[in-house]
């Protein structure tokens, strides 16, 4: 087997990894580069993916974040693409929601119609490859690592993952049952520049929100609409503190995709609505939200937890609601509000303002958790991707395992 990191050896996001065995090619992820990444005017030209003979090629998608799936519309339509079933539904809902304002999102919605889906932990084959999708916890729902086998070699491709989420507890058990050990691990290293960081578990963050909603009557949370765990965490925090929970129609559709729909998730009370206390949809007329007297009287009495997004629609609504002592929460990466960052979002900064509480935890693993996972897999060597500091990664782990640092476009034969 041969591994090529076409992109992602020294940057976060936009990763493209290739596994090749006897002419068969399996690619993992094909997404957009993040703001601040070393952009190139030239599109990637990868034989078997973007051009050339595709008869022995396929693409696996780890999850629906744009830096992992966002460029699939540029790929030839005959290329087979595979992703999780619920991840496809969420990605399709997002693309359809934005299709009225963007040609690219219309193209994405059309491309997703032809994407194949796999079943968690159910092994499938493609040419010489045996593939087992392993559910991992991430800030995108229905995210996957892949156990990829060919010619008696086993590689574990972690994708983006963490061990401090709601669904992280069974990862070790799943690894032991479905993977055991791996010859090589290709792993994300997003947080390598914070090696000592201990990230707040999602369940603790939910408790922090419960305390905040108890103390504060009027609450507005800015969170990604596809961060399913955070949405449900906010929902349950609101219900437990007897605060009405409000989302718009799109956010409600996203939550409905997950709520009680799948036997894997429905066992968890987190992804089920409390009877008689479902999320409330904001009233909308045309493109504007409506805050009538009945609604304002109700929230004046009971308070509210409102999930907001940037933009005038939400800003106008908030101006109509009671706001004495209102607290805004930023529950996403704070780099979006940092004018010195390439990802700075002026529209979000305007909506959130200067007076807010930062309540967030990373969608990526800390280095201690990564060390634990690699120890369980007991590989011959590890290959870092999805990192802006591969040398720091090597310094952290080289005493325990050989670390193979590849440049973009460089391959390693196992």
PLM-predicted stretches and their roles:
Residues 11-12, 120-126, 139-140, 279, ...:
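A short acidic, often aromatic-flanked loop/helix-cap motif at beta-alpha or helix-coil junctions
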Residues 2-60, 66-229, 233, 239-240, ...:
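His/Asp/Glu-rich metal-coordinating catalytic cores
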Residues 36, 89-92, 252-257, 335-340, ...:
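Short, charged/polar "capping" segments at the starts of alpha-helices
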Residues 65-67, 250-252, 311-314, 387-391:
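Short, polar loop motifs at secondary-structure junctions
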Residues 165-250, 324-399:
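Cap/insert and terminal regions of metallo-dependent hydrolase folds
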């Amino acid at each position: 087997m041969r591994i090529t990191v076409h992109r992602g050896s020294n940057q976060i996001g936009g990763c493209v990894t290739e596994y090749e065995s006897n002419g068969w090619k399996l690619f993992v992820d094909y997404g957009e580069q993040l703001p601040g990444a070393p952009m190139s005017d030239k599109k990637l030209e990868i034989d078997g993916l973007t051009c050339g003979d595709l008869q022995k090629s396929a693409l696996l998608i780890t999850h629906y974040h744009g830096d992992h799936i966002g460029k699939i519309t540029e790929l030839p339509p005959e290329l087979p693409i595979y992703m999780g079933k619920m991840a496809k539904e969420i990605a399709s809902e997002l693309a359809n929601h934005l299709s009225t304002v963007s040609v690219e999102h219309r193209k994405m919605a059309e491309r997703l119609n032809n994407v194949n889906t796999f079943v968690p932990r159910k092994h499938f084959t493609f040419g010489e490859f045996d593939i087992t999708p392993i559910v991992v916890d991430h800030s995108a729902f229905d995210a996957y690592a892949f156990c990829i086998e060919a010619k008696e070699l086993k590689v574990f491709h972690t994708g983006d993952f963490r061990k401090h989420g709601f669904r992280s507890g069974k990862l070790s058990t799943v690894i032991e049952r479905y993977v055991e050990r791996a010859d090589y691990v290709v792993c994300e290293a997003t947080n390598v520049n914070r090696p000592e960081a201990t990230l707040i578990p999602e369940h603790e963050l939910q408790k922090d929100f419960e305390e905040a909603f108890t103390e504060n009557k009027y609450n507005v949370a800015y969170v990604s609409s596809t961060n399913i765990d955070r949405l449900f965490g906010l929902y349950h925090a609101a219900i437990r503190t007897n605060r009405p929970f409000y989302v718009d129609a799109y956010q409600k559709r996203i939550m409905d995709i997950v709520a009680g729909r799948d036997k894997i998730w429905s066992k968890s009370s987190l992804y089920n609505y409390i009877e008689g206390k479902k999320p409330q949809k904001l009233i909308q007329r045309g493109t504007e939200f409506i805050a009538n007297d009945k609604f304002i009287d109700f929230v004046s009495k009971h308070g509210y937890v409102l999930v907001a997004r940037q933009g005038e629609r939400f800003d106008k609504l908030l101006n109509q609601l009671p706001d004495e002592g209102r607290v805004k929460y930023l529950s996403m990466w704070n780099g979006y509000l940092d004018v010195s960052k390439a990802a700075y979002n002026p529209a979000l900064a305007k909506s959130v303002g200067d007076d807010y509480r930062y309540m967030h935890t990373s969608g990526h693993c800390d280095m201690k958790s990564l060390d634990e996972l690699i120890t369980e897999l007991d590989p011959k060597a590890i290959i870092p991707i999805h990192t802006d500091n591969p040398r720091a990664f090597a310094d952290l782990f080289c005493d325990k395992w050989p670390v193979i640092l590849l440049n973009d476009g460089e391959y390693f034969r196992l």
